[in-house]
C-alpha cells in the first residue's frame, strides 16, 4: 500500500495555536506529515529559520507516537518541494474568505504545475479564526499578552526576542 504523505507549508513566524490545530487535524489524514518551514526572502521574519524549525519540532513531538512527522526547511517553488518529498497532498488552513481567495488561486496554479498533487483545505477551528502570525507579532511588540494565541514556548521566545525593544517615547 502506498504511504499517504501530506505536506503542510508555512513561514511559522511565529508558530501559533492555529497552525498547531491544522497540524493535528492534518496528521489524521495521512501516514506521514511533513511540515515545510519556508524561507521567504520577500518577508522579514522576526525569527531565524533555525528558531522557526525548532518551534515546529517542539509542537509536533507529541504526534510522533502515532504518525511519522518530519520538519524540513525549504526555499523556492512549493510544488518542487512537494515533489521532492514525495507528498501527494498539500494541506492549507483557511480562516476567512480572504484566505480562500488567495489559497484557491495558489491551488489552481499548483494543479497546473502538477495535477497529481491535491490541495486539501482545512477550515480553521472558530477559536483560531482570528489568529495570524502578523497580528501576534504586533501585539507582542506593543507589550500585549499573546499567551492565548501561542504555546508557552513560543510565548517565551517572543518575549526574549522582543526584550531589546524599549518602551515607545511618550509625546509629553
Describe each model-derived feature in a short phrase.
Residues 20-78:
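Short, surface-exposed acidic-centric catalytic microdomains
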Amino acid at each position: 500500500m502506498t504511504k499517504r504523505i501530506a505536506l503542510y507549508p508555512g513561514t511559522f513566524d511565529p508558530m501559533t495555536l492555529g497552525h498547531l490545530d491544522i497540524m493535528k487535524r492534518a496528521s489524521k489524514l495521512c501516514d506521514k506529515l511533513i511540515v515545510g518551514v519556508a524561507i521567504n526572502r520577500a518577508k522579514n521574519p522576526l525569527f531565524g529559520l533555525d528558531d522557526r524549525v525548532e518551534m515546529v519540532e517542539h509542537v509536533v513531538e507529541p504526534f510522533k507516537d502515532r504518525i511519522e512527522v518530519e520538519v524540513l526547511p525549504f526555499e523556492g517553488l512549493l510544488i518542487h518541494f512537494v515533489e521532492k518529498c514525495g507528498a501527494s497532498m498539500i494541506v492549507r488552513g483557511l480562516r476567512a474568505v480572504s484566505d480562500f481567495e488567495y489559497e484557491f488561486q495558489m491551488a489552481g496554479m499548483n494543479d497546473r504545475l502538477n495535477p497529481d498533487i491535491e490541495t486539501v483545505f482545512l477550515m480553521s477551528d472558530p477559536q483560531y479564526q482570528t489568529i495570524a502570525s502578523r497580528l501576534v507579532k504586533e501585539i507582542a511588540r506593543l507589550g500585549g499578552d499573546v499567551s492565548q494565541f501561542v504555546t508557552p514556548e513560543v510565548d517565551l521566545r517572543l518575549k526574549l526576542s522582543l526584550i531589546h525593544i524599549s518602551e515607545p517615547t511618550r509625546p509629553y
